[in-house]
Design a protein with these regions (language model features):
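Bacterial N-terminal signal peptides
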Residues: 8-22
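Hydrophobic alpha-helical context, especially transmembrane and signal-peptide helices
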Residues: 13, 31-32, 77-79, 102, ...
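Short intrinsically disordered, low-complexity coil segments enriched in acidic
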Residues: 2, 20-23, 178
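Accessory beta-strand-rich segments of carbohydrate-active enzymes
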Residues: 36-38, 45-48, 85-178
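Accessory carbohydrate-binding/adhesion or oligomerization-edge regions at the termini
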Residues: 24-81, 150, 154-163, 167-169
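N-terminal secretory signal peptides that target proteins for export/translocation
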Residues: 1-9
């Protein structure tokens, strides 16, 4: 009986210390993090654009898009019955106030189907494959503080043997988002 009580107190002590020691780390992380939603204000073009990641490109004729967006079904919704398996571009401008210069700035993507290249102010900063997995890109050193920044994402919905296609579109009760 004494051993059982002693074991109980050891487990209780260990769990208490684990919880107690994790609070300062969680509190500091919660105070430091600022999350901005960038799902609105995107311009979208279905098809390849040679300079899609460059700031000087005129995208005023592109379609307004809110993320998540279904690039593959645009054609179907416009009267066709073929799912688009090609390339598309998304572009958006944003500003970061200089008050955040001492912070780490990251962009989190919840998933891009199937593969993508991410550009900031005309420079390719990352690439990702695998539409079902999110990823994070650190943009801290590439920010134009207190000025417009152009974020451009080239998305490829082309067949990729590394990304499972799921089931046929006709049998789905959901959509793949780009």
């Amino acid at each position: 009986m004494v051993k059982v009580i002693e074991m109980f107190f050891r487990i209780f002590f260990f769990c208490s210390m684990l919880v107690f020691c994790s609070f300062p780390a969680l509190a500091g992380e919660a105070e430091a993090r600022v999350v901005l939603n960038m799902n609105t204000g995107w311009a979208f073009h279905r098809g390849e654009v040679e300079s899609g990641g460059q700031p000087g490109l005129d995208d005023s004729g592109w379609i307004a898009a809110i993320i998540p967006h279904i690039m593959q079904l645009e054609k179907k919704h416009c009267g066709g019955d073929i799912i688009y398996d090609g390339v598309g571009w998304y572009r958006r401008t944003f500003r970061v106030p200089s008050q955040y210069k001492d912070k780490q700035i990251k962009i989190s993507f919840e998933g891009v189907m199937n593969a993508c290249e991410v550009y900031l102010n005309g420079q390719k900063i990352s690439a990702h494959r695998g539409g079902y997995v999110g990823f994070v890109t650190d943009i801290t050193t590439r920010i134009n503080w207190d000025r417009d920044n152009l974020l451009a994402v080239r998305v490829s919905a082309e067949y990729d043997p590394l990304t499972p296609p799921g089931k046929p579109q006709a049998g789905m009760d959901f959509y793949y988002y780009s």
